[in-house]
Amino acid sequence: MVKSKLKLAVFIEGIDKYKNILELVNRLDKNLIEVDVYSLKLFNSKYSFNLYFRRRKFLFHKIYKSYDVVIALGVDKDVIKYAINTNANLKILFSYDEKIKKYPKFNKIVREYEDYTYVDEKLFKKNLPTVKVFNDNIIISCMNKEKLLDYTKDINYVFELKQFENKDLFSYLETNYYIYLKEGVEDLDNMLKCYLLGATIFEEEYSDIIGIKTKKLNALKSFKTKAKKVNNLSSYNKKIMNNFLDLINYKNYH
């Protein structure tokens, strides 16, 4: 039985303004997720996802296609109207504006996403993909320690995730996963939540997912978790997006 793809729509004002987000979206596994991005500004596309232009101030802000998940980026009124009026099981608004009013038609509102979803330009250009989450002290990378230390000198501790049989939401972070923790970081709860993105969206159960290599943090010698089996596509979609939200900003979404 062939499993249906997750259908994801992203609404933006323009592709240049949300480059970091789109770089992540562009790396989603196209075998699992079908991505449509709608922009209010004209563009020259270099991305592999479907990219569409939509004009402002249409009489009806309506996309005649249904999605599992709809995401609106920013506070642009036309972007928000398009997202609200598109049929979807889950609607999410990502906003960096603290004064934004509440939108009851969105299932979740995530704030200050630009500080928490990041692709390092320097490493990206050298084909060394890195994702930095939660604060400047935590880095997730598929690079080996020696290569990353060439770019970031003050990393002290290495946390290794075992290789998975399946790909996680960010499919470009493949094979061996590493988390590098700079000295002085005490927010271990948030750090551990980074692991859960890759550990909880799978349909099969896993145990002993995380092995931790460190001397100072010997209290965290082992961290075990099992992914819950997902019985239907709808709950599978929500599980993916919930973990996506946790990775971006666990504290600030509503």
Question: Which stretches of residues belong to each language-model region?
Answer:
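N-terminal pre-catalytic "stem/leader" segment of glycosyltransferase-like enzymes
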Residues: 1-67
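Conserved catalytic-core segment of nucleotide-activated headgroup transferases in glycan assembly
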Residues: 21, 131-166
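Catalytic core of nucleotide-activated saccharide and alditol-phosphate transferases
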Residues: 64, 79-135
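Short His-centered aromatic/hydrophobic patch
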Residues: 73-77
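Acidic donor-binding loop of glycosyltransferase active sites
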Residues: 171-186, 197-200
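Conserved acidic donor-binding loop of glycosyltransferase catalytic domains
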Residues: 182, 202-205, 212
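Short hydrophobic faces within alpha-helices
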Residues: 193-194
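A charged, aromatic-enriched C-terminal amphipathic alpha-helix characteristic of glycosyltransferases
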Residues: 218-254
